[in-house]
């Protein structure tokens, strides 16, 4: 049985792993639009999170399995291999394409110069080859990060990091140099609800307090608006730990430092204000708990100076060519991973990961999610294998115009990144664009 897995991030790799573990004869091709595997583990995990990035080694083991083949540089859909053609070449196709875009605030001024999504910022400092944005910190003294999840914590931390801490990472040189020259000394991370409802995890939160020459401040008055802050005993343990960390910062005495991170709560963004043709401040309405788990506006407003605004209010799935799509949830309709068309599950087409369930959970959540989808696929296998597939799909993919980057090509990229880092007196440094990546694949020094 031949199966195509579209996407080589955690959900794609765990799907491939589950397939070869549960079926003795399955052959899995893991296809990716990029020439590099690992998805958000490579292009979403903060460069200073080496322990999480080391998950690449686990995913690497999957992609090096004798019955798994990595094929990068293959676009599925418009401009690439049609989804219908892919379906003809394999007994089954599993889409693990994640949530490719970010949510917007929907407020005036959101499109001003100096206002960006956290996704754009992360892509820049992670050397995603599609990233064309730069100049994030140029001219900025104060930054506002809207959102209180782990991505918001990541970008806040990156803005407060110094060159000494960033140099040992694989961050590309242009981003490293820009952040080293940054004049940002104030970072405000803002949530519209209270601390007990924040999405960040305690480990990531505590990291903010360990940054050199940086102070974290929290308003005790804002924290006290949250009923669960006053009495955290009913809270689940993770939220309770967060509250205790915040309580400690709120009680701390001010100290002389070069940078400050201010954690703000119960502030709803209503407008980004212009100053000299770019963002100059963010305007918020104060909120209070509404007694039903949400918040309501108070009619009181506050402006926070900011020459840089990063929104981090969630990811969103995008339609996949040839598949049904639920615009409300940003997912492909499915039952246990089987794609649903016209109210009925369709054997042969499957989804796993964020495009299946929405952008929730941590990296490890994708393992049981993938296993559920693979269980559905293998239940359908007796019907699926009746299709006669004698030829290797690789030839047909090339005939369709694809130029696959096989595992040897990815290994060439890894070698080039190690050589680049050595030439700069650093460790491994990511190649920053498509041309550099493809030059490495083809052995070109140009």
Feature-to-residue mapping (PLM):
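Glycine-rich dinucleotide-binding loop and its adjacent helix/turn
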Residues: 102-181, 330-340
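C-terminal, flexible cofactor-proximal segment of oxidoreductases
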Residues: 338-342, 346-446
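Glycine-/small-residue-rich beta->alpha transition segments that form the dinucleotide
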Residues: 92, 96-103, 149-150, 306-319
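Core beta-strand elements of the Rossmann-like FAD/NAD(P) dinucleotide-binding domain
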Residues: 87-92, 139, 298-307
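Dinucleotide-binding/catalytic capping subdomain of oxidoreductase cores
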Residues: 26-30, 157-296, 377, 381-385
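FAD-site-proximal beta/loop scaffold in flavoenzymes
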Residues: 114-132, 272, 278, 290-357
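N-terminal Rossmann-like FAD-binding beta1-loop-alpha1 element of flavoenzymes
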Residues: 3-24, 153-159
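N-terminal Rossmann-like dinucleotide/flavin-binding domain of flavoprotein oxidoreductases
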Residues: 35-92, 243-258, 262
């Amino acid at each position: 049985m031949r199966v195509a897995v579209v996407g080589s991030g955690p959900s794609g790799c765990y799907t491939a792993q589950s397939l070869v573990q549960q079926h003795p004869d399955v052959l899995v091709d893991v296809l990716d639009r990029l020439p590099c595997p690992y998805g958000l583990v490579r292009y979403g995990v903060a460069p200073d999170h080496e322990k999480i990035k080391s998950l690449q080694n686990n995913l690497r083991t999957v992609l090096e399995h004798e019955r798994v083949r990595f094929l990068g540089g293959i676009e599925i859909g418009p401009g690439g291999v049609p989804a219908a053609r892919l379906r003809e070449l394999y007994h089954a196709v599993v889409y693990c394409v994640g949530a490719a875009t970010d949510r917007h605030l929907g407020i005036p001024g959101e499109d001003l110069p100096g206002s960006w999504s956290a996704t754009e910022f992360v892509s820049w400092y992670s050397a995603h080859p599609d990233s064309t944005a730069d100049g994030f910190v140029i001219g900025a003294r104060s930054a506002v990060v809207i959102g209180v999840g782990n991505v918001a914590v990541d970008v806040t931390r990156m803005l407060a990091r110094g060159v000494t801490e960033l140099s040992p990472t694989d961050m590309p040189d242009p981003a490293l140099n820009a952040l080293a020259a940054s004049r940002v000394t104030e970072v405000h991370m803002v949530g519209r609800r209270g601390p007990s409802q924040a999405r960040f995890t305690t480990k990531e939160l505590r990291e903010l307090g360990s940054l050199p020459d940086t102070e974290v401040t929290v308003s005790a008055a804002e924290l006290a608006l949250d009923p669960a802050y006053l009495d955290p005993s009913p809270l689940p343990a993770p939220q309770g730990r967060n509250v205790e960390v915040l309580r400690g910062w709120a009680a701390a005495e001010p100290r002389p430092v070069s940078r400050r991170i201010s954690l703000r709560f119960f502030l709803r963004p209503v407008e980004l204000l212009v100053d000299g043709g770019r963002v100059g401040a963010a305007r918020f309405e104060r909120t209070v708990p509404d007694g039903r788990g949400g918040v309501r506006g108070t009619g009181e407003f506050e402006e926070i100076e900011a020459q840089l605004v990063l929104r981090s209010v969630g990811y969103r799935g995008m339609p996949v060519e040839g598949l049904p799509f639920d615009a409300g949830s940003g997912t492909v309709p499915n039952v246990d991973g089987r794609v649903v068309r016209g109210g009925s599950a369709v054997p042969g087409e499957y989804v796993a990961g964020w495009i299946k369930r929405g952008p929730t959970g941590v990296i490890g959540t994708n393992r049981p999610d993938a296993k559920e989808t693979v269980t559905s696929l293998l239940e359908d296998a007796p019907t699926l294998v009746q299709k006669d597939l004698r030829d290797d799909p690789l030839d047909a993919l090339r005939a369709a115009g694809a130029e696959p980057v096989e595992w040897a090509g990815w290994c060439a990229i890894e070698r080039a990144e190690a050589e680049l880092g050595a030439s700069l007196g650093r460790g491994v440094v990511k190649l920053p664009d498509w041309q550099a990546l493809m030059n490495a694949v083809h052995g070109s020094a140009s």
